[in-house]
């Protein structure tokens, strides 16, 4: 009694088709696909901008002591 039968789903489908029409549903799905495509493109554009910003950075630093230097000083 609590679950939907096939007749419930057919009635819902008929109401949706009456409200939106046959041509409107594919148009809506196309709009959803375009939105997803634009979202993915926007995300990849942001990643490219982040990579470009990070590639320009350099770190000029020198280690004070390395492992080899420590071994040399402890053996002497």
From Swiss-Prot:
The Tat system comprises two distinct complexes: a TatABC complex, containing multiple copies of TatA, TatB and TatC subunits, and a separate TatA complex, containing only TatA subunits. Substrates initially bind to the TatABC complex, which probably triggers association of the separate TatA complex to form the active translocon. Keywords: Cell inner membrane, Cell membrane, Membrane, Protein transport, Translocation, Transmembrane, Transmembrane helix, Transport. One of its GO terms (cellular component) is TAT protein transport complex. It is a single-pass membrane protein. It holds the Pfam family TatA_B_E. Residues 43-76 are annotated as: Disordered. The chain crosses the membrane at residues 1-21. Residues 50-76 have a biased composition (Basic and acidic residues). The keyword Protein transport applies. This is Sec-independent protein translocase protein TatA. The gene is tatA. GO terms for molecular function: protein transmembrane transporter activity. It is found in: Cell inner membrane. Part of the twin-arginine translocation (Tat) system that transports large folded proteins containing a characteristic twin-arginine motif in their signal peptide across membranes. TatA could form the protein-conducting channel of the Tat system. One of its GO terms (biological process) is protein transport by the Tat complex. InterPro entries: TatA/B/E (IPR003369), TatA/E (IPR006312). Belongs to the TatA/E family.
